Amino acid sequence: MSSTQQLPFGGGVEFADNPEPRCPCLLLLDTSGSMRGQPLNELNAGIRVFRDELSADLMASKRVEVAIVGFGPVQVLSEFQTVDTFNPPTLAATGDTPMGAAVEEGLALLDQRKQAYRANGIAFYRPWIFLITDGGPTDAWMNAAAKVKSGEAAKHFSFFAVGVEGARMDILRQFGTREPLKLKELRFRDLFVWLSNSLGSVSKSKVDETVDLVNPATPQGWASV
């Protein structure tokens, strides 16, 4: 296990102390060499804003759980946990872009967490998966894309793909059912404020309730399509 990995409390203690329904959010983050410099600096700052915004929301701080899988190489940087124990890792740019393997690793991590919820009698909202990349995959990705499409069709999770400048939007379109979003400039902080607000709204709803989200692809928003 990497020294940067963070593990939540085990043995169901976390659920005994906090039996609130959970809203899991999985971040799949490109840490390949092309993200070096300002892109990764802004992404790191955005994740810290995300943590701070969630911490300031009483309900979200109890219900939203965050996990991070970085690629490449593929590594679980933070296991699912609520924001009171979530200390964002500082991402470093190395390697290539094994996006397919990262997606499959993330889906397996999410499945494990859902099993833990069920085993401990914890209700949970439909999970959110956010993929952020500035390039194209350097590994086999079609199996991962198929898993995302089938998972979304079965309502196992909601999948969002965000392309930074240089991203292969044509490939991102193969993942899931939503049109991928293109990040304007390097507005990661705006993205994560939107994400925290959206998850905050979800966490205040009933588990099976549909929540209307603010469209991020408006002229004033952080994304374009």
Roles of regions detected by a PLM:
Residues 43-56:
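An active-site-proximal "capping" alpha-helix that borders the catalytic cofactor pocket
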Residues 86-125, 139-140, 158-172, 183-194:
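Von Willebrand factor
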Residues 10-19, 61, 122, 147-157, ...:
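P/S/T/G-enriched low-complexity
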Residues 31, 73-76, 135-138, 165-168:
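Solvent-exposed loop/turn segments at secondary-structure junctions
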Residues 1-26, 31-41, 55, 114-119:
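Acidic, polar low-complexity linker/tail segments
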Residues 62-90, 169-175:
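Short beta-strand-loop
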Residues 32, 50, 137, 141-150:
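Mixed-charge (Asp/Glu-Lys/Arg
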Residues 29-32, 43, 68, 106, ...:
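DG-centered beta-turn motif at the end of beta-strands
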